[in-house]
Amino acid sequence: MDGMLTEGTSAIPPPQPPLEPIERPPTPPPLPPDESALPPPPTDPAPPPPPPDSLAPPPPPEDVPRSTYTVPVVVKKKKVGWGSSKSTTPLSVEELLRKKKEADEAASRPKFLTKSQREKLALEKRAKEIEHERRIRAASTNGSMMSDSNGGGGNSNGRASPTTRYDNVNGSSRTSIPTAPRALRGEIPTAPAAMRSSQAKNNDPRPGNKVPSDSAATGEKRTAPEDAQALLTRQRYMGADQTSSFSAKKKRRRTTERKFNFEWNADEDTSPDYNPLYQNRSEMNFFGRGRLAGFSDDVVDSAAKRYAKALEDRDLEAGSARAREILEMERRRREEGGRNGLDLHWSQKRLDQMRERDWRIFKEDFNISTKGGSIPNPMRSWGESGLPKRLLEIIDKVGYKDPSPIQRAAIPIALQNRDLIGVAVTGSGKTAAFLLPLLVYIAELPRLDEFEWRKSDGPYAIILAPTRELAQQIENEARKFCNPLGFNVVSIVGGHSLEEQSFSLRNGAEIIIATPGRLVDCIERRILVLSQCCYVIMDEADRMIDLGFEEPVNKILDALPVSNEKPDTEEAEDARAMSQHLGGKDRYRQTMMYTATMPSAVERIARKYLRRPAIVTIGNIGEAVDTVEQRVEFISGEDKRKKRLADILASGEFRPPIIVFVNIKRNCDAVARDIKQMGYSSVTLHGSKTQEQREAALASVRNGNTDVLVATDLAGRGIDVPDVSLVVNFNMATNIESYTHRIGRTGRAGKSGVAITFLGNEDADVMYDLKQMLMKSSISRVPEELRKHEAAQSKPTKAGGGQKRLDEGGMSAPKTGSGW
């Protein structure tokens, strides 16, 4: 054999195709197997495994002629080591790059095969698959025959023992009990039967080459029930597998397979050129943005003219008439603003062009929010208010140019005889908002001087105010409108004698402005009756409750006649039903309430005496106006605060008048004396002053004779001092509502103002609310001391079951009933 494997083997001719495999001597036949347990025998005998490379090929058999026997060609491996020489010349880089480039080009170029070549490759591939399956089948047959010949797990008589039957769970024994579905019973064993039994007994699997099964050979993936259950459990708790199964080589159905293709191209269509009307008609709609593609009116007009000319050229008779109609429509469209004015601002539209969207934008611009049923839209100007012409002339003469937000929303509602709750910040024009509808209401009633008995039946309307100063201020404002109309207005407040006020009522009065306490005294002394009162207005209702006037207010409202009371039904929201006269003369009573905050006591009064009220809110409840800049300084001690006040007044930044607020009466005179020592004139205003002293102090400040007004919370509500540039809280208010009304004395009527507050540790109860108010203001800043203070981090809890602390003066009202 060594001579056959010498270096002369290169001269041997190429090998010929192999002949039939060599027949081996026959082996004794095994026991007849169970045909139902064994796979079918192969049709062709399986060839023996090839010999390893290290062994020499076997000699030719004696019974085969030498001429037909072909010696397999074996290429001798070159020996490396002793007596061999290794090539030391490496390949150059250029040659490697050239070879790589050629290989890439060859791989990138498509290889075209003929039909015969493709069929040949397919046949070769199929032959390899068949050969592979045949080898697998032969290996499984040989393994089962070897296990039977060795008597694996059987008795001497060839039968399997009972123990072996139940031990061979994997199906290696042909007599074992089936433990799997029929489709999985024929899996190929992984080892001989003797080894399987020993492995199962010792529970020690031995490593080895696993023979692939039929399912693996055919490419099918079978999943055991246990594996499927484990997969579902893993997906349930760990989520679905994120690995994508997308394959670019996967054959997909083309979406254009069933698409019908015409024999002619779309570019060959000449029909648009036939009619000139469709050439450039709609090309503008696809460019730009806006009302009509963002083009100006000139472009739109030119397009309309071009379209009209095309119509005339097409048809001289009917086309000319149609062209004139189109030009007329375009002219009307330009006059109306296009698409009924959708592209115009609400201030440029007519009233009939206003839509729901425009009214919503209008309310957002003025920060108006309404609540209730059947509420009319607000008015945009005095001309759209619906007021009588005579009253509009007086408004123009007084100098009211544009209505304020509360006037825009409240006047149209009040003109429909609806009960109203107006929630607005201080200095927003609430006085005119309830005076003008009141004058329209009483103008339709009989005059008091028509009959003598009407004068003794009392007024048509009463206006309640919490303080004397506010009542007199409302009286002065009402006289501007009532005197030209011939109505009589009388104020009934404390500080004046009852005889003087009784003399003022001798000729009757259509409108009475009073404080709750003095009005109750007049009713109890039979000086005044409310037999024909049909209009009630409560201004600063929350302030009246804070001053302890809840019980007097209830007495006044209970003294009103019940014959003209509104029903608590949906009719109270019907403007036409509420405008009717009862019995031909009387009208339904109308009640209005204006407030800056809504405490529970005010809600109780509103629930008891108002019928289906419309609620109008301007801004946010309890917030200061945006025209006031709030500044907070931490200063403890009276001396330091007085020194800081002197620096503020001496800075020259603020022009008089200036208001300084303190908490207690005795501090007013002390602070006023210190201000006079600084070189500024000052007056005081508090509850211990007489009515004449109060009026004189306010008059001196309004006339410009006094620079600084030092006051308690008495001046914090409703007192209108024009052009106040600065408010100084020498002592912080005891609650945030009083603070809101204090700083509301400045920044009124749209003007700007500044409020400076001196804060100390004794004001811990209001620090949280003060911090929240400063954060909501767009022009104010929260100081670091207040931001980091412990009391400003959470809202304090009220002691005593939430009882609200009242301001100075007044009597406490019993808190009965539930909130509204």
UniProtKB/Swiss-Prot annotation:
Group of enzyme by EC: hydrolase
Binding site for ATP: 424-431
EC assignment: 3.6.4.13
UniProt domain Helicase C-terminal: residue ranges: 627-790
Domain of life: Eukaryota
Motif (Q motif): 380-408
Pro residues: bias regions: 12-62
UniProt xrefs under PROSITE patterns: DEAD_ATP_HELICASE, HELICASE_ATP_BIND_1, HELICASE_CTER, Q_MOTIF
InterPro entries reported in the protein's UniProt record: DEAD/DEAH_box_helicase_dom, Helicase_ATP-bd, Helicase_C-like, P-loop_NTPase, RNA-helicase_DEAD-box_CS, RNA_helicase_DEAD_Q_motif
Biological processes, Gene Ontology terms: mRNA processing; RNA splicing
GO cellular component: cytoplasm; nucleus
Known function: ATP-dependent RNA helicase involved in mRNA splicing. May destabilize the U1/5'-splice site duplex to permit an effective competition for the 5'-splice site by the U6 snRNA, resulting in the switch between U1 and U6 at the 5'-splice site. May also act to unwind the U4/U6 base-pairing interaction in the U4/U6/U5 snRNP, facilitating the first covalent step of splicing.
Subunit structure: Component of the U5 snRNP complex.
Family according to the record: Belongs to the DEAD box helicase family. DDX23/PRP28 subfamily.
Domain notes: The Q motif is unique to and characteristic of the DEAD box family of RNA helicases and controls ATP binding and hydrolysis.
The protein's name in its UniProt record: Pre-mRNA-splicing ATP-dependent RNA helicase PRP28
Organism: Coccidioides immitis (strain RS)
